[in-house]
């Protein structure tokens, strides 16, 4: 009987019986654009689009019939539903006890079994045909003897929910797909029999409980080359080994296709005698050359003794593909493991590094990974030469061997590609390791990937929130959490960078121990950092180096268009910078705005602690604070390189015996086209300048507008605290006030000058304590002023026995072509003049 039409609606009380007296049964065929099965009493939809019903079930108000009507009909007839327009959806539970067949066909779309389908009768069958894919969202159970299931789809079949599975538990049950017949396995003995035909096609008819039995790997030193479809069923409670073989797993090696399989409570172990070829061990397969998809392993334990490659699911993925796989459990590589991974020990391309013939996609590992060797360990993959795409690892990765390479996702990415992947958890390494939240050692490409958690190692390590050591490309990636190391290179994103980091970000608490190097984004940079940022909180202990973005930027290092916003704290004898602790390379178009704080005898700069390279078109806005006998600058603490077109606006404060400048503390290099606006203060004796505290280099076309203050016996200048012999200042100016304590040298432009000052001006106010020497241009001049001007107000305090002059209190050098105007015009040019003053 055929019911055909554009829209068909079968009444709920319809009864169809095609049984004959001869024992044969006919079929009821429904062909329509709305040939779907609905749950009873659900509401609305339009054709081809499912909408949530009142009971949160997807429903078709225009469905041809409901599940109860279909179930009743299957008791008295075979039923064939054909959707002529779109997807055919079974949205209500269907069950029957007869030997009849349910046939479901979608001529133009998918067949979706969203609710349970169950038949208990002998010879009952279900046949599904789809132009697209068959999706099974619930249980499909055919439990009678000689039951048959047939699934035919251009795009195959998938089990889309965790509880979805097929049961074919009766005697002589059968299965076929796309014209191919499969053997149905019901027990451990059936698994063992796969050895007889390694090119065969198999399905699991039900879950298999091994009850703790020992099980030798399928294969007998040969690869499986057939099809093994678990149909959503689980194999559980086995103890797998493979004595005498280099590959250990449920399958020794897979060169075929394994899909839709669960593995639970399985322990797998490889023991490799000394001197033997390393073994590959994984719960599912030692080697994979084929295709693995939709495999879920839970509560598994994988371990090795001797040289081995160890993975939670696969030991070695050699040019194979693993998609939509997951592992939950424990992986232990022992003392001699080469590579250890939560999902795969290694992922190796046979074509070329980074080729997708070795592919892990949409997969996940939640595994505790432990290794005591100096090899590689990763939460997902130990060693990757292929592609890891849209995959995730969570849990703990702990490598205790010196020199190991450890990553939350991948231990070593050697020419491989990691894309849109994540790791979260706790990643730890020992001495001299490369440890990264995502990748331990990267010599490939990391794109659009993230880590969230804790990364830690001891001394001599390279520790990064995302990558421990980078010799490849890191792009558009992020790290959040904490990165810790002893006397190590520690970075919020990368511990040590020798290649490229771009468009990336870190928000990490970064902590390096004594003599360690810490950077908010990168610990040690000898490569290129471009368009990246961090708001990491960075700390380094005594004698360490700390930078808001980079700890140390080496001579080959470049920092371009990048920024740091977090605070930087360093201990005694340390070097700290808001952007870079030490710069021997190039910084261009970059900025920092966090506070910088350091202990005694330290060097602290708002942007860079110590600069021997180039700082260009960059700025800092954060405050800088350090303890006694330190060198501090609003932009750079100590400069022997070049500062060009850069500025600082944060306040600078430091203890006694220190050198402080609004831009640079100590300059032996070149400063040009630069400016400083912040207040500079030295508590006690020191050298303090609105721009430079102590200058033994060259300053040109620069300015300072902040106030400057220092204590007793100091050299204080609106622009330069002390300008040394051989130093020069040109085309520069100061407009802030300068104040010194007792016995200080205070100048509107320079506190104490032994060098050359040309074409420069001052226009602030100078003042001091008892016996202070105050000058509109310099407190004391032993060098040369050429074409300098001052409008400085010299504020004398009655009774303080101060010395003052419009140019200088003391002149033992030369003033040439200089002038005093405004508040300075009515004063003697010098209080004591033992040099020359001429037009």
List where the protein language model places each region.
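Alpha-helical scaffold domains
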Residues: 9, 32-34
């Amino acid at each position: 009987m055929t019911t055909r039409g554009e829209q068909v609606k079968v009444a709920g009380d319809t009864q169809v019986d095609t049984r004959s007296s001869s024992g044969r049964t006919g079929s009821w065929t429904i062909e329509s654009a709305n040939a779907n099965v609905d749950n009873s009493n659900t509401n609305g939809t339009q054709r081809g689009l499912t909408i949530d019903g009142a009971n949160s079930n997807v429903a078709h108000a225009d469905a041809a019939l409901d599940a109860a009507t279909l179930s009743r009909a299957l008791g008295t007839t075979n039923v064939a539903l054909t959707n002529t327009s779109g997807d055919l959806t079974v949205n209500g539970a269907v069950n029957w006890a007869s030997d009849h067949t349910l046939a479901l066909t979608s001529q133009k779309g998918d067949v979706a079994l969203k609710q349970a389908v169950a038949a208990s009768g002998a010879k009952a069958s279900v046949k599904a045909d789809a132009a697209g894919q068959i999706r099974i969202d619930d249980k499909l159970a055919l439990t009678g003897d000689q039951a048959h299931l047939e699934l035919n789809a251009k795009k195959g079949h998938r089990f889309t929910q965790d509880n979805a599975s097929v049961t074919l538990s009766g005697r002589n049950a059968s299965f076929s797909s796309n014209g191919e017949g499969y053997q149905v396995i019901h027990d451990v003995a059936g698994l063992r029999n796969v050895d007889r035909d390694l090119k065969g096609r198999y399905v699991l008819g039900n879950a298999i409980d091994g009850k703790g039995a020992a099980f030798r790997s399928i294969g007998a030193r040969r690869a499986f080359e057939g099809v093994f479809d678990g149909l959503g069923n689980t194999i559980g409670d086995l103890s797998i080994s493979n004595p005498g073989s280099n590959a250990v797993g449920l399958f020794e090696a897979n060169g075929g296709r394994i899909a839709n399989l669960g593995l639970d409570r399985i322990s797998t172990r490889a023991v490799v005698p000394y001197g033997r070829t390393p073994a590959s061990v994984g719960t599912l397969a030692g080697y994979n050359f084929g295709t693995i998809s939709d495999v879920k392993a839970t509560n598994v334990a994988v371990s090795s003794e001797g040289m081995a490659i160890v993975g939670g699911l696969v030991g070695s993925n050699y040019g194979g593909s693993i998609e939509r796989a997951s592992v939950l459990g424990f992986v232990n590589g022992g003392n001699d493991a080469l590579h250890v991974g939560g999902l795969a020990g290694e992922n190796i391309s046979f074509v070329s590094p980074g080729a997708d013939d070795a592919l892990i996609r949409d997969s996940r590992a939640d595994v505790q990974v432990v290794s005591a060797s100096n090899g590689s360990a990763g939460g997902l993959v130990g060693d990757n030469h292929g592609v890891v795409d849209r995959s995730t690892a969570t849990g703990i990765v702990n490598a205790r061997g010196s020199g190991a390479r450890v990553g939350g996702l991948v231990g070593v990415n050697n020419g491989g590609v990691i894309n849109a992947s994540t790791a979260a958890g706790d990643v730890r390494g020992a001495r001299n390791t490369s440890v990264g939240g995502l990748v331990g050692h990267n010599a490939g490409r990391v794109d659009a990937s993230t880590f969230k958690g804790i990364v830690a190692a001891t001394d001599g390590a390279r520790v990064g929130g995302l990558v421990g050591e980078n010799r490849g490309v890191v792009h558009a990636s992020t790290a959040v959490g904490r990165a810790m190391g002893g006397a190590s290179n520690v970075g919020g994103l990368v511990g040590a960078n020798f290649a490229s980091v771009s468009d990336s970000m870190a928000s990490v608490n970064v902590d390096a121990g004594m003599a360690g190097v810490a950077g908010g984004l990168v610990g040690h940079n000898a490569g290129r950092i471009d368009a990246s940022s961090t708001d990491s909180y960075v700390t380094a202990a005594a004698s360490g180096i700390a930078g808001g973005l980079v700890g140390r930027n080496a001579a080959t290092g470049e920092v371009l268009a990048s920024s740091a916003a977090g605070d930087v704290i360093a201990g005694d004898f340390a070097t700290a910078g808001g952007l870079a602790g030490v710069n021997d390379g190039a910084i261009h178009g970059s900025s920092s705005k966090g506070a910088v704080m350091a202990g005694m005898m330290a060097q602290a700069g708002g942007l860079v602690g110590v600069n021997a390279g180039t700082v260009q078109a960059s700025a800092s806005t954060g405050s800088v604070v350090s303890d006694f006998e330190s060198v501090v600058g609003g932009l750079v603490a100590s400069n022997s390189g070049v500062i060009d077109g850069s500025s600082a606006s944060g306040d600078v404060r430091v203890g006694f015996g220190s050198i402080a400048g609004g831009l640079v503390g100590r300059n032996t290099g070149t400063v040009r086209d630069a400016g400083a606006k912040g207040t500079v203060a030295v508590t006690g004796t020191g050298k303090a300048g609105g721009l430079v505290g102590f200058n033994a280099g060259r300053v040109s076309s620069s300015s300072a507008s902040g106030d400057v203050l220092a204590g007793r016996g100091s050299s204080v200048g609106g622009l330069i605290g002390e300008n040394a012999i051989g130093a020069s200042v040109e085309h520069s100016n100061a407009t802030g006030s300068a104040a010194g304590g007792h016995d200080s040298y205070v100048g509107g432009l320079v506190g104490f000058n032994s060098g050359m000052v040309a074409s420069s001006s001052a226009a602030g106010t100078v003042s001091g304590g008892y016996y202070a020497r105050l000058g509109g241009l310099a407190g004391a001049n032993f060098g040369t002023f050429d074409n300098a001007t001052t409008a400085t107000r010299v504020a004398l305090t009655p009774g303080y026995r101060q010395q003052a002059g419009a140019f200088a209190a003391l002149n033992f050098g030369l003033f040439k072509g200089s002038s005093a105007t405004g508040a300075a015009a009515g004063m003697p040019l010098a209080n004591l003049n033992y040099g020359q003053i001429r037009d």
